[in-house]
Amino acid sequence: MHVLSIDLGTSNTVAVLSTAGRPPRVVEVDGAATMPSAVFADGAETLLVGREAERRARLDPARFEPNPKRRVDEGSLLLGDAVVPVTEALAAVLRRVAEEAVRQLGGERPDEVRLTHPAQWGAVRRAVLLGAAHRVPALGANLLALPEPVAAAAHFASFPGRSLPPGGTLAVYDLGAGTFDCAVVGATGRGFVVLAEDGLSDLGGLDVDQALAEHLGRQVSTADPARWQRLLRPESTADRRAQRALREDVRAAKEALSRHPQADVPMPEPFPDALVTRGELEALIRPNLLRSVEVLAATVRAAGLEPRTLAGVYLVGGSSRIPLVATLIAERFGVVPTSLDQPETAVALGAHHVPREGVAMRTDEVAPQTHRHTRPFPPPAAPHTALQPAHADPGAHTGPQPSRASAHHGPQPVSGQHGPQLPAHGRPPHHGPQNPAAHPQPP
């Protein structure tokens, strides 16, 4: 039996394939374990994806969308003069992964496909993802969906010495490119149950990039304020190319600071190149990383647990590599968090270890008027099965839906400061804290 699991992330997509009882392995696309989740509109009907989309973006940035998943609520994307449904953009990403999997299977299609999704995604957002998958013939035969933290917990439990026996619990801290998500997952005799989950829709690796770009802008923009304004609001193709190059260099500097105490950042002319230190970056992002750790702590409490009773705190998502993340969690919880293998691949690999009928989402059973984190462990006798066959109508509604909002964690700017800033590509403008009562939980 051929099983393909796909973790379609905000910035990167990871696929894992297992065949004939062999251990699951990452499907390399274009020679890499991760494929950019980017799309480029090449004419009215053709969508390029992955690294080819990134390459073409250098020629015409207006036709490029680096993070289509982040725009799942918008219905459609304007790429140059082409209007592309978000469902079709996601389908293009899934199609490229499926093509590579079929090639590696010698032309055969997977017998089963598992798609992971954020635990807080409701029925409408899941319908967008599943509708995209149904547009890809190679994925439609036996399509299942499961929450990302459940897959992460299964990955944790698959390692020797890291078992999660029935009754055991694990906290999952997932800092991806687009959002921060956390959950407490409990092991049952049949599989796993999500005991509590929460997150921050305004915190992810892209927001860390934004904070660093703002910081650099405050340092160098005085050299030519008019030119810097054109970087913020491009007026020409050359301006858009310069803006994209700056974004890439800022991201590379952020990643380098996870390994080194300082990093050089090439700046477009006429601005001088900049040097940024890990200490500077940590000062910029510490307040918001502290927010994420407090959300995790509140989620553990909502599950009726204490940190000392957990089997561990598991770090997933590429941005969890930032050293300050582990430091703050250790200070708050008194335990050193665990990161196994590449955090980018943990969810896709873990999806293979989840029993087909062994997932429950406790939060789905909470009445709309109640708080999302009130149900205790153990699970009810007949829990809602979240790992389920996907029967989404490919034409399901894909229009806007409410953004996530937590009554105790209102949105805040990532840097905590004001100044020149690059627009966050693909994210609606931030307008500060809002009344949580006016923004229900996502469907």
Where do the model's predicted regions map?
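Gly/Thr-rich phosphate-binding beta-strand-loop-beta motif of the actin/hexokinase/Hsp70
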Residues: M1-R25, F159-L195, V250
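Conserved A3 ("GATE") glycine/threonine-rich loop of ANL adenylate-forming enzymes
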Residues: L8-N12, P36, E148-A153, G178-T179, ...
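Acidic, glycine/GT-rich loop-and beta-edge segments that sit at the periphery of enzyme/chaperone cores
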Residues: T10, A223-Q229, A346-L349, H353-P443
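Phosphate-binding loop and its immediate beta->loop->alpha context
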Residues: V16-P137, N142-P147, Q210-E255, P261-A263, ...
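Conserved NTP-handling cores and scaffolds of large molecular machines
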Residues: G43, V72-S76, A98-A101, L105, ...
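Gly/charged contiguous loops adjacent to phosphate- or pyrophosphate-bearing nucleotide/cofactor binding elements
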Residues: L59, L206-A330
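Conserved phosphate-binding/catalytic loops in two-lobed NTP-binding clefts
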Residues: A138-E148, A326-H352
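Conserved phosphate-binding catalytic cores of ATP/NTP-utilizing and phosphoryl-transfer enzymes
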Residues: L144-Y173, A302, A348-A360
